[in-house]
Structures are given as structure tokens and as C-alpha cells.
């Protein structure tokens, strides 16, 4: 067995009455842990290699804590706490970044992104949806939907209320980790698996999906869809949209460069370069016909928006008299043609 791992984490989670995992909380996930740490815990777990999620007892957690005491004080302290748990425990070991095979593995990878250890698109998330059970997220934690009605009745009989906040595959990120230096006005609008960079403010209408996020700093008042990453200093106006990779059958990865502004109720279906502005209310899809204007507001040519993908210093607007979508630049006609040909 190799003493190297891609990732390792000790977790505490929730199971249904059949013993199936509903969710797992990893307080301190590790990316590429030290070989000596792996060598110390492998014999105690009976781990021989591969990607595995191994359920452990509190006694085993105490043994692991002792083994790690001279090697990693933080993980030793965590395991000491886990040894007192009244909830199911699991150790998840990923030898490689391969397709997912279990719910604890899926939760570990979502944690790695939200802990800012890996950026969106940096992990293999193949097979994640079948491995994330659709559960009721309540004031008493995750509840299997098949057990929800009985749990609600039990609560009422005790004079309590089991409040259901959402029914979804993904929990909100802040129930698992709150990254340093961020503001999130409505925590339900940021899913676990979001990467929220330092200096990011997510206002009430903002939303960040899993495997998506922001470099920060920036203001998010619109939707950062799955797969989308927003560069530093960029702002998304109220109600604006970024087209994700999960809907519409598109395979273009949408990104927003640095210093961009997407206006309120606007949207993009192409990746933006740096210092781009999209006028409020204007939705640009890849096939949108755009009149390209030079530095003197003269028409250079009509192109599809996809031909401008990734270009910097562009202003997208709609002509209020003709309705034509225009792209204004600070470049001459010659420079624009050269840029377009270079892109092709």
C-alpha cells in the first residue's frame, strides 16, 4: 500500500434507520496528508488502499487519536472529540481523485471545495448526484424522507416542532464551514461545495451553487450557477444570471474574469474576459448576434457572442432605438479584427 493519499478526513454524520449515510460533517479535511500520518492510521483501520469510507467506533477513534498525537496535534484533538460522539463516525480515505463511489466520499469532495482547498473544476465529481440522497434538512439535522412523517409526529407529541428548512440533495454550506472573510446575507442560498473567496459578499438575492464560486473580493447579488467561477473584483448585479453547465446541454464552461460587472437582471452564456461590462437587462447567449463597434462607435462587423468569449475590455449593451445588441470596445477596427482572428 502506498503511504500517500489524495485526501483524508475524519467525520461524524447522520444515517437513516437502515444504516445508509444521509450526510457527513468533516471538521478538518486534509488534502494530500503527510505519508507518516497515513502510515500511522492504516493498520488501525485495516486500510489496504483505494478509495474507501470506513465506519469506526468511538474506541477506534480514541486509538486513532493516540496514534496521531505525536504527528498532528489538530487531527489528534479532533479525534479526541470524535471519540466522545453519540453519532456515527467515518474515516474517508481517497487514494486518488477518481469517480465517486459513496456518500461520505461525495461529502468529502464538497468539503474540500468549500474549505478552499480545491477550486471549482479541480475535482472529479462524476457520479455525485445518485450518491447524494434527497433528504429533509430540519432543525434536528438531516432526516430521511421515508422517516420524516413519523419524526414530525414524535416531535409534536413532545410539544416540539420539527421544522423543515428544505428538501434537497445539497445542504447549505454554512452548516458545515464558514470560510474566513465573507458575508452571506441568506445562508440558504449558498450550497455546500461552493467556493466563496475571501472578501466576497453574497447579498440576499445572490446564489452560489456547488462546484462554483468566487475568487473574491466581489459582490454577488445574482446567480453563480454550477461550474461558474467569478474572478476577483467582479460584481454580479441583482437578479443576474450566469448560465451553468448542468442545464441546456451546453458544454461551454462559463467564467467571469477580473473586474467585471454584470448588471441587474442581465445574463451571460459565454465566458467573459477581464474588465467586461454587461448592461442591465441584457442576456447574452452564445448565439446572440452582436454588432461590434470600434473606438469611434463605427460598425466593424456582426459576430456571434461566442466569438467574443474570453476577450477583455468589452461593454455589451442594447441599442435603445433599434434593439440591436452592441459591443463597444476601446480598440481600433484593425485591432478588433486581429483579436477575433487570434481567438479563432
Which role fits each region the language model picked out?
Residues 106-109, 180, 252, 274:
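General structural feature for long, well-ordered alpha-helical segments within catalytic domains
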Amino acid at each position: 500500500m502506498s503511504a500517500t493519499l489524495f485526501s483524508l478526513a475524519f467525520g461524524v454524520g447522520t444515517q437513516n434507520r437502515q444504516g445508509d449515510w444521509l450526510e457527513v460533517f468533516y471538521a478538518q479535511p486534509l488534502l494530500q496528508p503527510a505519508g507518516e500520518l497515513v502510515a500511522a492510521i492504516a493498520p488501525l483501520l485495516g486500510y489496504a488502499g483505494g478509495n474507501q469510507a470506513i465506519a469506526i467506533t468511538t474506541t477506534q477513534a480514541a486509538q486513532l487519536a493516540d496514534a496521531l498525537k505525536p504527528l498532528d496535534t489538530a487531527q489528534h484533538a479532533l479525534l479526541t472529540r470524535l471519540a466522545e460522539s453519540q453519532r456515527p463516525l467515518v474515516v474517508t480515505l481517497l487514494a486518488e481523485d477518481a469517480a465517486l463511489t459513496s456518500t461520505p466520499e461525495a461529502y468529502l469532495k464538497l468539503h474540500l471545495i468549500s474549505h478552499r482547498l480545491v477550486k471549482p473544476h479541480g475535482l472529479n465529481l462524476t457520479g455525485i448526484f445518485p450518491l447524494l440522497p434527497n433528504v429533509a434538512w430540519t432543525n434536528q439535522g438531516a432526516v430521511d424522507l421515508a422517516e420524516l412523517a413519523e419524526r414530525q409526529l414524535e416531535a409534536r407529541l413532545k410539544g416540539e416542532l420539527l421544522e423543515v428548512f428544505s428538501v434537497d440533495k445539497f445542504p447549505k454550506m454554512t452548516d458545515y464551514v464558514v470560510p474566513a472573510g465573507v458575508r452571506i446575507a441568506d445562508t440558504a442560498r449558498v450550497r455546500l461545495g461552493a467556493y466563496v473567496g475571501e472578501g466576497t459578499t453574497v447579498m440576499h438575492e445572490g446564489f452560489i451553487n456547488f462546484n462554483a464560486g468566487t475568487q473574491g473580493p466581489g459582490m454577488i447579488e445574482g446567480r453563480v450557477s454550477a461550474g461558474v467561477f467569478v474572478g476577483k473584483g467582479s460584481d454580479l448585479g441583482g437578479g443576474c444570471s450566469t448560465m451553468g453547465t448542468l442545464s441546456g446541454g451546453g458544454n461551454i464552461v462559463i467564467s467571469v474574469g477580473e473586474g467585471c460587472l454584470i448588471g441587474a437582471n442581465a445574463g451571460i452564456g459565454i465566458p467573459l474576459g477581464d474588465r467586461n461590462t454587461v448592461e442591465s437587462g441584457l442576456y447574452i447567449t452564445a448565439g446572440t448576434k452582436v454588432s461590434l463597434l470600434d473606438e469611434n462607435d463605427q460598425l466593424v462587423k456582426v459576430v456571434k457572442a461566442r466569438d467574443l468569449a474570453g476577450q477583455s475590455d468589452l461593454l455589451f449593451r442594447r441599442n435603445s432605438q433599434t434593439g440591436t445588441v452592441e459591443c463597444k470596445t476601446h480598440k481600433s477596427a484593425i485591432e478588433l479584427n486581429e483579436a477575433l482572428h487570434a481567438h479563432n
